[in-house]
Amino acid sequence: MNNKNIRNVAIIAHVDHGKTTLVDALLKQSHIFRSNEQVAERVMDSNDLEKERGITILSKNTAVMYNDVKINIVDTPGHADFGGEVERVLKMVDGVLLLVDAFEGPMPQTREVLKKALSLHLKPIVVINKIDRPGCNPNKVVDQVLDLFIELGADDDQLDFPVIYASAKNGIAKMSLDEESDNVHCIFETIINTITPPECEIEGPAQMLVSNIDYDDYLGRIAVGRVERGTIKDGMPVAVCKADDKISNGKVAKLFTYMGLNKVEVEEMQAGDIIALSGITDINIGDTICDINKPEKIPFVNIDEPTVSMTFSVNDGPFAGREGKFVTSRHIRDRLFKELERNVSLRVKETDRAESFEVSGRGELHLSVLIETMRREGFELLVSRPKVIFKEIDGQKCEPIEKLVVNVPDDCIGNVIEKIGRRKGEMINMEPAELGHTKVEFKIPARGLIGYRTEFMTDTKGNGTMNSVFDCYEPYKGEISARTRGTLVAFETGTSVTYGLYNAQERGELFIGPGVEVYEGMIVGLNSKAEDISINVCKEKHLTNTRASGSDDALRLVPPIQLSLEKAIEFIQDDELVEVTPLNIRLRKKILDSKTREREARSKAKE
């Protein structure tokens, strides 16, 4: 297959705009699956977390054949926290499918990835998805996309983009809203006619940039990337140029190309195609695999720096080691450093305490996905409150600023603007959206967003959406007020009982029900006042010899607040930690002993 018959395309979209569903439709209609094969929904989201959250975290590769042309499709994460994945992927492709929701229009994360794609001079095709959704306005969205392209400095060729109207869920796509259609073939045809074949030297010494790493229990590390020059053959000796300019030698053990969702073994692949190869043990993202006689490095995309850091440490609580398989600092250290091999936007630093590690990432979601993955693998650990990473620019302390877009019901807008204002947010735009909603844009310090999402969902009664993306660094904006309510802290170790909880719930809201094991210093609820109070939730009712009438025994408890990992991370303050185990997520104070805590608080007050 010469490279005239290859097209490499990435799909860019905001979270939940239907990108993975569209890839499903393309795969099904290119007859990749046998007629009797059962196909799951969202086949590209391969890990459990992706399926549960409905987001794509890792970029995936697939390929389809249409009229003798091989179309390599790369599915990219839509969330800005996984921007490191997106930037690498764009180096492998010659064009992008920009997928936009016909109801919501272009969103901030779409904007960031699109900006990167346009700067690399990739050819865009715009797909307006969910045209079957009630209240949507596809024509208005096309105008918004055009405005966005102009704002991002697209050249004349990029501004002349084709528009396809689609409903990925129903498996249809058409070139105009009036057309009838029962398939997505026009997407294939537009890709073939609009996106140019890869410009590569088929002759010449082999060269390939590693854009992704896969892992197979049998084959070990698998390097994924596009062949930039020459031909790579099964069994050929190669040179590996590292990011630090060191060169090592290796040999290609097995060579694969993509077809549908599978890797197909091949003997050789020419420039222009996306391949996977095994056999090189110490291969990493950003390395260049070349002809052994002509090692030449390909420059690698600079990945955006992390903006948020958290401390991961060994669980030293009273229940440590009960529920997890991997509990020591060596286990945690090895797992974090292994994660660095694939997760290019992550940074891990050892601290002056052997049992703690500072982990930095692109945002709260980026880090919480890592914590959740480790939890499912059987790890036990403590994590601290996220902190933003400050920078010094021209002698001035600067902090990361996010661009925040909220879409809220009109009757909640005043409350939301006031709360964001308190968190040092500045409103930059406000416009009416469909169906009694208002869309407001803000610039806000990343610190101000930590812990706000849960409050936002409460204020909008679950009917609002908020999306943010890193914008720039600006001078430090000053203190932001923290949580206004204190906590209810367990006073002794034991099992919670209804009587103790009934007395505790008069002071605030509870996080636990009866029959839960607690320890001294564990946070069991939220106080209605500003200070923390110690409370005994294990306290039994003293028995008397007076017969009860029955009514005073029937103590009614309010159902406890369920805390997900994200909510727990957002909730804690600087003197608190989240204890993460495979079975439980607990909140606790850093100092468990109540008397020591009181002494610390008094000495701080004196300072």
Task: Go through each PLM region and give its residues.
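P-loop NTPase switch module centered on the Walker A-proximal segment
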Residues: M1-E104, Q144, I213-D216
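Switch/connector loops and helix/strand junctions flanking conserved nucleotide-binding motifs
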Residues: R34-S35, M107-P108, R133-N139, G171-S176, ...
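Gly-rich Lys/Arg/Thr-decorated short loops/hinges at beta-loop-alpha junctions or inter-strand turns
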Residues: A40, N67-I71, K91-L97, V126, ...
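Canonical P-loop GTPase G-domain recognition
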Residues: K123, R133-N193
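Active-site glycine-centered loops adjacent to acidic/histidine catalytic or metal-binding residues
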Residues: N129, S167, G363
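Accessory interaction regions appended to the cores of large information-processing enzymes
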Residues: P162, E189-N193, P197, G220-E607
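Short boundary/loop segments of OB/S1/cold-shock single-stranded nucleic-acid-binding domains
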Residues: T196-P197, L209-D217
